[in-house]
Regions:
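Hydrophobic beta-strand segments of well-ordered beta-sheets in folded domains
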Residues: 1, 20-21, 54-58, 74-75, ...
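Short, basic/hydrophobic alpha-helical segments
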Residues: 1, 98-113
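Gly/Ser/Thr-rich loops at beta-strand to alpha-helix junctions
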Residues: 2-9, 61-66, 116-127
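Short, well-structured alpha-helical interface segments that form or flank functional binding sites
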Residues: 6, 95-99, 112, 124
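Short Gly/Thr/Asp-enriched flexible loops that form oxyanion-binding sites at enzyme active sites
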Residues: 7-16, 126-134
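Long, charge-dense
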Residues: 16-46, 89, 140-158
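Redox- and metal-dependent alpha/beta enzyme cores, enriched for Fe-S-associated oxidoreductases
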Residues: 38-103
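C-terminal functional regions that serve as terminal interaction/effector modules
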Residues: 106-114, 119-158
Length: 158
């Protein structure tokens, strides 16, 4: 592992979205995007109710299926087929950013101001999530880390 997921999100939050950056995953073979034209695009799924309480848990299942926390208000952003190597091309990362941003905007429109993130995400998605979380939009942002058999609080981004 390159670094714990919560620390990658913290790194992303420090870089922010104003600085241009390209984040690659750490593939087994090389530090380059996959050039194969038949590389399948990931398909992301999320559903956000029209109204939510101020504080919610957001499960993010991309590299694996993340266990849901013991919380009454849980929403999920996930990929159809979780896989550690799911983001293979820059286009895939752009699709992820676009879809995850739509997820965040729906949370805000639904009334969420305090968010607890429960991620199972690859390197690039972890850093990008940190870059995309708008500190002026959310009052508090908490990231949890899976330490079997449960989630443990790891870092507060805001």
């Amino acid at each position: 592992a390159f670094a714990p997921i919560p620390m990658l999100m913290k790194l992303g939050s420090l870089i922010g979205d104003k600085t241009e950056a390209t984040v690659l995953d750490l593939p087994a073979e090389r530090w380059l995007w996959d050039k194969h034209v038949d590389c399948q695009e990931p398909s992301f799924i999320f559903s956000v109710p029209h109204s939510l309480p101020r504080e919610v848990a957001a499960v993010i299942s991309i590299s694996n299926r993340a266990d849901h926390p013991d919380s009454p208000n849980v929403v999920e952003f996930r990929v159809v087929e979780p896989n550690r190597d799911i983001i293979r091309q820059e286009k895939h990362l752009n699709i992820f950013r676009q879809q995850f941003n739509a997820f965040l905007m729906q949370l805000v429109r639904s009334g969420v101001r305090i968010i607890h993130l429960y991620p199972a995400t690859p390197i690039s998605a972890s850093v990008e999530i940190g870059r995309m979380l708008l500190p002026k939009t959310f009052e508090e942002i908490h990231v949890w880390e899976w330490q079997a058999p449960t989630w443990k609080p790891a870092v507060r981004l805001k």
